[in-house]
Amino acid sequence: MRIGIVCPYSFDAHGGVQVHVMDLAGELFRRGHEVQVLAPASQDTELPDWVTSAGDSIAIPYNGSVARLNFGALVARRARRWLDAGDFDILHIHEPITPSVGMLALQAATGPVVGTFHAAMDRSLARELLSPATVPLMEKLSARIAVS
């Protein structure tokens, strides 16, 4: 199976979601699947051949931490090109409604999509303001996973 995985957080910094994505990709490889990963990363960051950089990220204070995300028209084009080139049987997006490359990939996705949610949080003004944009995106998900 051809599997595309999208990580919203930059591979320039170490974090739990990045580790989860890399461990998942490694296990899927071991099980015989073809895997490609798309994530923010600077040009200086060494990446495995199967990881594609979505471009540089910016640091944004979020949920008591700092999230290194990327977004915008250029990132959206990179995500579409990656999706087209990958011709994935399934797409697995981590934090699919976080404003980063994952959200852009979800907008462009045409096949089955699994969304994994890593962060639990109380209601927030940001989530409330983004709700009109995120509800249609949530409906595109074929399956949802919550990490405990």
Task: Please report, for each region that a protein language model flagged, where it lies by residue.
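Extreme N-terminal starter segment of soluble prokaryotic enzymes
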Residues: 1-3
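Conserved alpha-helical elements of sugar-nucleotide-dependent glycosyltransferases
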Residues: 16-27, 101, 130
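Histidine-centered beta-alpha loop that forms part of the nucleotide-sugar donor binding/catalytic region
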Residues: 8, 94-95, 117-121
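N-terminal strand-loop element at the rim of the active site
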Residues: 7-12, 22, 26-74
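A short helix->loop->beta-strand "cap" motif at the edges of active sites that frequently abuts
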Residues: 110-112, 141-142
